[in-house]
Amino acid sequence: MFSPLRIVSLNRVSNVTGLITPMSPINCLVHEEGALICWDCATAGSHEAPLMNNTAVNSLDYCDACFFSPHKMVGAVGSPGLLIMKKKLFLNETPNMPGGGTIFYVSEGLHRYTQVLTEREEGGTPNILGAIRCGLALHLHNHLGWDWIQRREEEYYQQTMEVLRQHPNIVILEDDTDCPKTSVFSILIKYHGYRIGVEMT
């Protein structure tokens, strides 16, 4: 009997409140049920090192796919998004978007795509400059150390929150639980709509 493909996709970090979703218990639960787990680390990517495998503790504690946005990191403006996947998921012989660099052999009657995964799934001219920026930004983060970055972020976050909470016309969209969070936050500004309309006319 055919088993349907089940995919669970979750945010690692909320881009509104900064709350962090725990990966390990969810990875294990999803894999116990025979599904795939994909993590959207677009917000988390600039705050922590991506962790694809934590199998030393539990063999089910791994990500099937992870994607994030390096352009949110210092120095990586203009860099392409990154998709990291397990090799076992690349099952198609035809690339998702055939283009230059994906063809291995062509004749009048047939064609064959390359078996090199990174070439087969990246048709056309790559964003070379963006990829270099991404690599340099990741190198910088690794050089500084993720622990150091998180400590500095926490200092700046607390200083910022202290000032914002004192302002009468600023509402912080935050969760008052003790859940772990990053230095991401969102605010609303109290301002009467009628006044805006009058000032715009």
Question: What residue ranges belong to the model's regions?
Answer:
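Pyridoxal 5′-phosphate
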Residues: 1-201
